[in-house]
Design a protein with these regions (language model features):
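The AdoMet/dcAdoMet-binding core of the Class I SAM-like
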Residues: 2-4, 28, 53-163
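A general beta-strand register signal
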Residues: 46-47
Length: 165
């Protein structure tokens, strides 16, 4: 039996691809998480039925949201990543020796776990000594945080705050 993944882009356009393998399909407190494999894109992550990234193209997004701000900021030492469960932005940031601390604030612990299991080439950035991963709501984290950030990167895949934050 063939399995297909389809993502609606507009009312007139739908992207569909044949799935070779379903590696993971779980429901977290925040969203449905699927890791699938296709011939065209390799492994890819879908959240609530929408593709977040694939092995073939993740570098485009991660490099753009990381290296452009780093190129124009004169002195980055402390960075906040809002979201960042897949670790791709952290992986790019750890290449900068000037950075002393990277705080990743992600509300979905299960998403971090799924990414660690299925995308270790991305999440390796989360294991650097300068990286701290906080599993909590970003707004709540910021309200209770002392200190400043030189750079904040929004890599959120879902709402930045919950109704009780």
């Amino acid at each position: 039996m063939e399995m297909w993944f389809s993502e609606l882009h507009t009312s007139n356009v739908k992207l569909s691809m044949r799935i070779e393998e379903q590696l993971c399909s779980v429901e977290s407190d925040c969203q449905r998480i699927d890791v699938l494999v296709s011939d065209e894109f390799g492994k890819f992550l879908a959240l609530d039925g929408e593709i977040l990234f694939s092995e073939k193209d993740e570098f485009i997004y991660d490099e753009m949201v990381t290296h452009i701000p780093m190129a124009v900021h004169p002195d980055v030492k402390n960075v906040l990543i809002i979201g960042g469960a897949d670790g791709g932005v952290a992986r790019e940031l750890i290449n900068y020796k000037c950075i002393e601390r990277i705080d990743v604030v992600e509300p979905d612990e299960m998403l971090v776990e799924v990414c660690r299991k299925h995308f270790p080439e991305l999440t390796c950035g989360l294991d650097d000594d300068r990286v701290n991963v906080y599993i909590q709501d970003a707004l709540r984290f910021l309200r209770n945080k002392t200190g400043d950030y030189d750079l904040i990167i929004n890599d959120a895949t879902c709402l930045l705050y919950t109704s009780d934050a």
